[in-house]
Amino acid sequence: MSKSTVFTVLLLLLGMAAYSFGWVQAVAEAAAQYVQIFNNDALRLGLLACIAAVLMLPAFLYLHYVTQSVKNMTAAFQKLTQSHQSCCDFQHHRLCSRYAEEVKSLRDRYKNVRQTYVMAAVLCQVIIFGCMFEIVKAVPFRLHTPPIVSTGMALLLILYLLFYMRMYLLKLFQHGTLFKKILACVLTGAGIGWMLSFTISELLFLIILAAIQQIGSFIYKRFSNRGFTSLDL
């Protein structure tokens, strides 16, 4: 069993224990008391969404860095392979010594991209989101809408999430094992059923948080692309 797997299992067990013993709910209720200082529901939701976005920012930035690094590493590896077409026989695995050195140098350049770090960043986001969502549930909001409105908003949010994950889902159903496909279908169905039970305040919190993260993602991509363009020049 790899270190990342052990780390993931331990964190999941810790999270399940904290939730089952009521520690998460107790902390959420205590935090909700401070949020209730503000009398405006829109201000409460905006404040909670901003706090969640700020707490998730380090993991958010690292995951964007990993995504960009993987793209750059793939492009650099393809360029490296093309430059050694004349001296290496890739079909029969006859490679020159310079190619091996350059591949090692390329790997060292992107050594910060590790599966353990990625898993830790994802779990960090999940834990922070779960805690903030519990705080939203603990705050007594005065927002009331007809069921059709909340159901419609939930469906729009579900469609957005499915569109956001479309590349991963397509890759999974094209190349994944049968077990992974069944697991993905079960988890997707459970997630859709769970989201349809959300209140209007919970849905608005998710929408505001998603909007903040989309804006942050857009800004990050603009600045990172400018940085890479200036490096290329």
From Swiss-Prot:
The chain crosses the membrane at residues 4-24, 46-66, 116-136, 145-165, 192-212. One of its GO terms (biological process) is bacteriocin biosynthetic process. Its main location: membrane. It is found in: Cell membrane. It is a multi-pass membrane protein. The keyword Glycoprotein does not apply. Keywords: Antibiotic biosynthesis, Bacteriocin biosynthesis, Cell membrane, Membrane, Transmembrane, Transmembrane helix. Involved in the production of the bacteriocin subtilosin. This is Antilisterial bacteriocin subtilosin biosynthesis protein AlbG. It comes from Bacillus subtilis. The gene is albG.
